[in-house]
Design a protein with these regions (language model features):
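Active-site-proximal segments of metallohydrolase catalytic domains
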Residues: 220-296
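Short pre-active-site segment immediately N-terminal to the catalytic Zn-binding motif
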Residues: 196, 293-314
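Bacterial Sec-dependent N-terminal signal peptides
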Residues: 1-24
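Fold-level signature of zinc-dependent metallopeptidase catalytic domains
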Residues: 155-212, 225-235
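Extracellular/periplasmic catalytic domains that process cell-envelope and extracellular macromolecules
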Residues: 174-178, 215-218, 273-278, 295, ...
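Beta-strand-enriched, solvent-exposed domains that form extended recognition/catalytic surfaces
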Residues: 29-154
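Active-site recognition of the HExxH zinc-binding catalytic motif
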Residues: 310-327
C-alpha cells in the first residue's frame, strides 16, 4: 500500500514538474502578447516568393502555452521561431493557404499573383529568427523565407490596445488560460443587423457542439462574436455582376468556382480582431446562397441563411481547425491533389503508403483493406445520392461504428487511389450527422494537444 501511495506521489510530482517546465519555457522565451506578422506570398504554378509586409504587436497571447515546438499536423506550410543565431526551436505552427491552392489551378500557369497571409506567434522576449516554409503535395519545401525580428524594433505597430471592435462572449471556457479561443466575425451585416449576426453565431455554436468530440469537450472552448459592421448587407457575387461594400470584401466565384465563398483580405480580417481574444476564426457571411471554405489555421468562412448552414459551418471548421481533408470525390472531374505514392498529412485520408500511422488501429481484425462499401460493393468510392445514403444508413443501424471503420476508396477529390475511414462522415456529405470515428479521434487528439 505504501509503495502504491509513493508511486502515485511520484506520478503526481512528475506531472506537476512537466507542467511547470512547460510554463517556465513559455515565460522564459515569450511575453503574454501576440506578434502578428503580415506576409505577401507571390508566384505562379511553379514558383513562389515570400516577403514580410508588416510587424504588429497585439495585447495578450491566446494560442498554445505548451507543446510549443511541436506540430499536431504537418499542414501545407510551417512557421518556426528560433532563438537568434541558433537552431533551437521555441515555437512552431502549421498552416495552409489560398495561395497554395490557387497554384493548382490553370490560371496559375499563365499568371503571377500575390496573396495576403497573416500568422500569429507569441511575442518573443529576445531577438528571434522566424522561418516560413511552403510545401508541395510531396511534403517537399518549395519556398522558404527566414527573417529576424527584434522585439524592441520601434516600427512594430501596436494595435488592439484601444478602439477594439465590439464583441459578445457566447461561451466562457472552464479554464481560459488553457483553452481554445474561437471568434466569429460578422461579414456583410449592417449595424442594424447585429442581433441577427449574434443569433447566427449562436446557431453555429450549437451545431458544432452537437458533434463529438466537441460536445463532450465543450468547456475547453472560449467563444466570442465580433460585431464588425459593413456598409452593405450581403456579399459580392461576381458572376452575377453584384459587388457589395463589406468589411472583409468576401465574394463567391473564388478561383472561378461559383460556390467557393472566401475573403482574400486577411489583413482586414485580423485588423477587425485586434484586441479580441482569438486564435481560430469563423467568418459568418450574411447570405442565403450556398457556399463556404475552410483553410487550416487561417479561417473558416460560411454562409448563414441557407438551409444547410449548420452542416457547412461544422464541415468547414473541420478544415480550418484540424486540417481534415474532404472525403468526397467527383465523378465528373478528377482533381489530382494527392500523389498515390505519398501519404497525405491529413489525418482522415490515406493512400495506404503509411496506413499504420493513420487509423489502422481503429479497424476491427479481419476487415478487408481496401474495404468494400457496405451492401453495395460495386459502388465503392463513388459519391452517393442523398436517397441512396439514407437507405444504406437505415440498413446499417444495428452495426457498431467501429465495425464499419475501414479504408474506402474515393476521397480527397479522387475516385481512385485515395481512401477514407468510413462510408460517410461530416467531412464527406451534408447528409451524415456525425464525424466518423477517425475524424473524432483526430479532433480529440488536437483538442487535448492545445488544452492539456
Amino acid at each position: 500500500m505504501k509503495k502504491n501511495i509513493l508511486s502515485l506521489f511520484m506520478m503526481l510530482a512528475s506531472g506537476l514538474g512537466a507542467n511547470a517546465a512547460a510554463d517556465v519555457d513559455f515565460e522564459q522565451n515569450f511575453c503574454d502578447s501576440t506578434l502578428r506578422i503580415d506576409y505577401t506570398f507571390l508566384g505562379n504554378a511553379t514558383t513562389q516568393s515570400i516577403a514580410v509586409d508588416k510587424l504588429n504587436m497585439m495585447p495578450r497571447w491566446y494560442g498554445k502555452h505548451a507543446h510549443l515546438d511541436e506540430l499536431p499536423v504537418e499542414g501545407n506550410g510551417q512557421i518556426t521561431v528560433r532563438k537568434h543565431g541558433t537552431s533551437e526551436v521555441i515555437y512552431r505552427n502549421s498552416f495552409s493557404t489560398l495561395f497554395q491552392e490557387w497554384q493548382s489551378y490553370d490560371e496559375a500557369k499563365n499568371n503571377v499573383k500575390s496573396f495576403e497571409n497573416v500568422f500569429l506567434v507569441p511575442m518573443p522576449r529576445d531577438t528571434v529568427d522566424i522561418t516560413v516554409d511552403l510545401r508541395n503535395n510531396r511534403h517537399e519545401v518549395v519556398g522558404s523565407l527566414t527573417h529576424t525580428v527584434a522585439p524592441k524594433d520601434v516600427l512594430i505597430r501596436h494595435i488592439g490596445f484601444g478602439n477594439t471592435t465590439p464583441y459578445v462572449t457566447l461561451q466562457q471556457a472552464k479554464d481560459t488560460t488553457k483553452c481554445i479561443h474561437i471568434a466569429y466575425v460578422a461579414e456583410g451585416y449592417q449595424p442594424g443587423e447585429m442581433a441577427t449576426f449574434v443569433e447566427d453565431a449562436k446557431i453555429a455554436t450549437e451545431a458544432l457542439f452537437e458533434h463529438e468530440p466537441f460536445s463532450s469537450m465543450r468547456d475547453r472552448f472560449n467563444i466570442v462574436a465580433v460585431e464588425s459592421a459593413s456598409v452593405d448587407s450581403g456579399t459580392s457575387e461576381p458572376s452575377k455582376g453584384v459587388w457589395r461594400n463589406t468589411v472583409l470584401g468576401s465574394h463567391f466565384d473564388t478561383f472561378y468556382s461559383n460556390r467557393y465563398l472566401t475573403t482574400l483580405n486577411l489583413k482586414s480580417l485580423h485588423d477587425v480582431l485586434a484586441g479580441v481574444p482569438y486564435e481560430h476564426i469563423i467568418v459568418l457571411v450574411n447570405t442565403s446562397e450556398y457556399g463556404g471554405g475552410g483553410i487550416l489555421n487561417s479561417y473558416n468562412l460560411s454562409m448563414t441563411h441557407h438551409p444547410q448552414y449548420r452542416q457547412v459551418v461544422v464541415h468547414e471548421f473541420g478544415h480550418s481547425f484540424a486540417g481534415l481533408a474532404d472525403e468526397y470525390a467527383y465523378e465528373a472531374e478528377q482533381i489530382p491533389m494527392y500523389p498515390h505514392d505519398v501519404e497525405p498529412w491529413e489525418k482522415n485520408i490515406t493512400t495506404l503508403v503509411d496506413f499504420h500511422n493513420k487509423w489502422e488501429n481503429l479497424i476491427e481484425p479481419g476487415t478487408q483493406v481496401p474495404t468494400p462499401m457496405p451492401e453495395d460493393k460495386s459502388e465503392k468510392g463513388k459519391v452517393k445520392s442523398e436517397k441512396s445514403s439514407k437507405v444504406k444508413r437505415e440498413k446499417r443501424k444495428g452495426k457498431s461504428e467501429k465495425s464499419e471503420v475501414g479504408a474506402y476508396e474515393g476521397a480527397g477529390y479522387s475516385l481512385k487511389g485515395v481512401y477514407r475511414p468510413y462510408p460517410d462522415c461530416r467531412m464527406r456529405s451534408n447528409q451524415h450527422k456525425d464525424f466518423c470515428p477517425a475524424c473524432q479521434k483526430a479532433l480529440r487528439d488536437l483538442i487535448n494537444f492545445y488544452t492539456e
